[in-house]
Amino acid sequence: MSSSAPIGVFDSGLGGISVARQIAKDMPAEHVLYFGDSANAPYGIKTPEQVRALSFDIVERFVRQGVKAVVIACNTATSAAVNDLREHYDIPIIGMEPALKVACDRGDVPSDPHHIPQRVIVAATPLTLRERKFATLMDRFDSQNTIFKEPCPDLVEIVESGRLGDHDLVMRTLHGYFDQYDMEHIDSVVLGCTHFVFYRDYFRELLPERAAVIDGNEGTVRHLGVVLESLGKLAPEGATGGVELANSDPSERIAELSRKLLNV
């Protein structure tokens, strides 16, 4: 596989555009093929078997297009399908997981040997929070920290329907999920869905100034770079990269919304 081959990036819909955008920013020589499966969104309320089948269909599409790696820019699809995809394909398959370690590590102070327990909300889809992969991740950190799981399916729908700019709707939806918590005593919110990255400014409005809003996009793209470099597959310096957008929903509304989110 040539180092100038593209990278395939997919999501259940439009959320993974936030990851494609991060790749374009951090790895500008890379050519990204983005595929959003908006016709089948949301994945977060489907069964793991349904998500696996959809994920395999998309990766097959990428393989036919000659990609050198695939990024599953979807926490839900990662939870349900990443292990099976890695067993089946001989190209790197990079997954996403909620950046819980980053949130909990904020309690480690270099000058103090004692961990400061963190109070963390993980906002994600229902399926991500139900899957064994997340339970295993949570088991690593919940003995020293207080971790709240908050499924937020409506946040996916708001992005997919193009209503992200409706401030009143978004804040009303966020308050519906998070007013049950004493936000003054929350240390961080982990955005465990790539759709939720587009809500970063709204979460900042919701949270006290000292609290962090954390997502896994930068770490995922950094890992992608390390993997490609180790294989000698980074695009040549000076190559003209970019992002090509495709979607299972062929409507102009989705195409226009995709372009808008890529350039937010």
From Swiss-Prot:
Binding site for substrate: 11-12, 43-44, 75-76, 194-195
HAMAP family, alphabetized: Glu_racemase
Active site: 74, 193
Gene Ontology molecular function: glutamate racemase activity
Catalyzed reactions: L-glutamate = D-glutamate
Species assigned in the record: Bifidobacterium longum subsp. infantis (strain ATCC 15697 / DSM 20088 / JCM 1222 / NCTC 11817 / S12)
Pathway(s): Cell wall biogenesis; peptidoglycan biosynthesis
Keywords: Cell shape, Cell wall biogenesis/degradation, Isomerase, Peptidoglycan synthesis
Domain of life: Bacteria
Protein name per Swiss-Prot or TrEMBL: Glutamate racemase
